[in-house]
């Protein structure tokens, strides 16, 4: 007779499996099929070749099982074991799909991207392969876990056995590391991205880092910035106020811009407008979640990543100087960059430019005068900084980002499983997004030109990060910065100044054209925008103002 209260009397039969039996099978399942992306990468790197490679593979397999067993040993309690196994199995299946399909890795930044994904972006990532992988590798094993009876144990006995499992598994892991130290350390040193493929330990580590951030950074504190900011003398000298549009591009890579030497004519409209394109521009992150807050910060990439408190940003300083600021979004939000300035979503339900919950970027030009007119009159008459956050080239559904009229390069990839398309189809779909971005930016400049009688107008465009299009079997973006390929970090940066803005800023397009090969980074954006808008503050650093070399007082 079974005692279901958690103890068994003498002579009673014990029903169900020991908890460690479930843990062992789950650890083996996740270490093998749940790490398909890891095993594929090790094979493609020829790290599993020969007897030495097989030994390394066996060591990595045992190490994965041991670490997973140690993790599960901490959770092997009656109320938590099956929920924990379910979460890890489903997480492992999700990780397998994305790492195997898109060749991405899962670190804290990538997990942040996942947590901030909106429904539209999530839909683009789902398909038959997604659901099949989650079902076969996650949900069906989870059902098996719940259908398997587990032997009840006294709390004291369970605690002792759990402790023994954790210590034994860690001892086994340490033994494997010591025994395989030379080949293992060599593999990790020469192929640093491999460590981010250990599934689902990579997600557990990433979530742990995210959970620890409040201990490293006081999120409740927001330090004021540039409280001494004032408008410079140009505001008294020039009758017309400045109107600057800052377009924060999405997932555009410099290599595919015709302006930057790309063989295809992806940017003919901008080329005809004689804009200045800075060809050596670099992002401070490889994802929107990392780059967007960083590029609006005065700290620069290194200091921003290690900051202990949050600090106000460029938009706060501009607004504090008495200017009107508006954030217009056709994307997934501003990542708190616009938290203290007016912000609006560009989408207009029922508009022909919108379908399926998404809009083409030209929607941001519709009703723009009315949006600006609604800003505070006193600030608006002094000057306006309008930040546009377009959909741009956001993947993997590149084919959704360009209207039919701008699909110049065909056939294009129409799948969200990019590896299912040929390289040419994938590049065609991406290049069509750049062609549409070209048209959108040219249309924005045309809108600005039409208002030159009332304002001194300018446009600055810079992308948040780049994109991988199958080079080295990598897709999308978000690799850790230290190991990310240049195509995920090298971004387009374009400036256009009207003649009126040239006069008020003392910066000429002719001079800027002499600087197009100078290296610039997102670290320059904060100071360059203050310089263009003639906002004086102690936080401004002239050496980081990319336009300062051309500015004539």
What would you call each of these model-derived segments?
Residues 2-16, 20-22, 34-133, 139-553:
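Catalytic domains that recognize anionic headgroups
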Residues 23-31:
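Charged, amphipathic alpha-helical stretches
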């Amino acid at each position: 007779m079974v005692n279901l209260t958690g103890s068994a009397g003498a002579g009673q039969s014990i029903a169900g499996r020991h908890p460690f039996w479930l843990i062992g099978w789950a650890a083996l399942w996740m270490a093998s099929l749940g790490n398909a992306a890891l095993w594929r990468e090790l094979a493609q790197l020829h790290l599993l070749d020969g007897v030495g490679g097989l030994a390394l593979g066996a060591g990595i397999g045992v190490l994965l099982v041991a670490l997973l067993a140690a993790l599960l040993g901490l959770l092997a309690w009656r109320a938590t074991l099956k929920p924990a196994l379910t979460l890890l199995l489903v997480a492992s299946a999700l990780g397998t799909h994305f790492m195997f399909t898109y060749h991405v890795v899962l670190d804290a930044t990538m997990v942040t991207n996942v947590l901030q994904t909106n429904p539209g972006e999530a839909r683009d990532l789902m398909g038959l392969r997604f659901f099949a992988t989650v079902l076969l590798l996650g949900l069906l094993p989870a059902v098996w876990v719940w259908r398997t009876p587990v032997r009840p144990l006294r709390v004291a006995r369970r605690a002792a056995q759990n402790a023994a499992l954790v210590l034994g598994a860690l001892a086994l892991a340490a033994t494997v590391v010591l025994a395989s130290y030379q080949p293992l350390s060599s593999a990790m040193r020469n192929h640093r991205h491999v460590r981010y493929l250990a599934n689902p330990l990579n997600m557990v580590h990433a979530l742990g880092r995210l959970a620890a951030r409040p201990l490293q950074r006081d999120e409740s504190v927001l330090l004021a910035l540039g409280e001494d900011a004032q408008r410079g003398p140009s505001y008294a000298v020039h009758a017309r106020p400045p109107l600057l549009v800052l377009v924060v591009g999405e997932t555009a890579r410099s290599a595919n811009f015709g302006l930057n030497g790309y063989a295809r004519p992806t940017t003919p409209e901008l080329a005809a407008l004689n804009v200045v394109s800075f060809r050596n521009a670099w992002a401070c992150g490889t994802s929107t979640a990392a780059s967007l807050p960083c590029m609006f910060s005065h700290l620069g990439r290194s200091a921003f990543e290690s900051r202990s408190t949050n600090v106000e940003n460029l938009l706060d300083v501009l607004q504090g100087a008495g200017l009107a600021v508006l954030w217009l979004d056709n994307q997934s939000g501003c990542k708190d960059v616009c938290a203290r300035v007016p912000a609006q979503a560009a989408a207009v339900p029922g508009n022909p430019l919108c379908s399926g919950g998404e809009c083409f970027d030209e929607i941001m030009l519709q009703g723009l005068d009315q949006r600006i007119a609604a800003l505070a009159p006193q600030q608006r008459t002094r000057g306006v900084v309008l930040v546009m956050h377009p959909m741009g080239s956001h993947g993997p559904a590149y084919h959704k980002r360009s209207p039919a009229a701008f699909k110049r390069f065909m056939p294009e990839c129409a799948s969200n499983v990019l590896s299912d398309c040929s390289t040419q189809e994938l590049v065609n779909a991406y290049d069509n997004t750049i062609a549409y971005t070209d048209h959108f930016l040219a249309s924005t400049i045309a809108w600005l030109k039409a208002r030159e009688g009332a304002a001194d107008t300018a446009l600055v465009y810079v992308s948040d990060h780049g994109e991988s299009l199958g080079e080295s079997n990598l897709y999308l973006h978000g690799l850790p910065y230290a190991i990310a390929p240049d195509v995920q970090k090298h971004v387009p940066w374009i400036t256009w100044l009207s003649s009126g803005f040239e006069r008020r800023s003392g910066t000429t397009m002719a001079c800027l054209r002499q600087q197009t090969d100078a290296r610039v980074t997102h670290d320059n954006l904060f100071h360059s925008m203050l310089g263009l808008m003639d906002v004086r503050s102690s936080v401004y650093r002239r050496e980081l103002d990319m336009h300062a070399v051309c500015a004539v007082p």
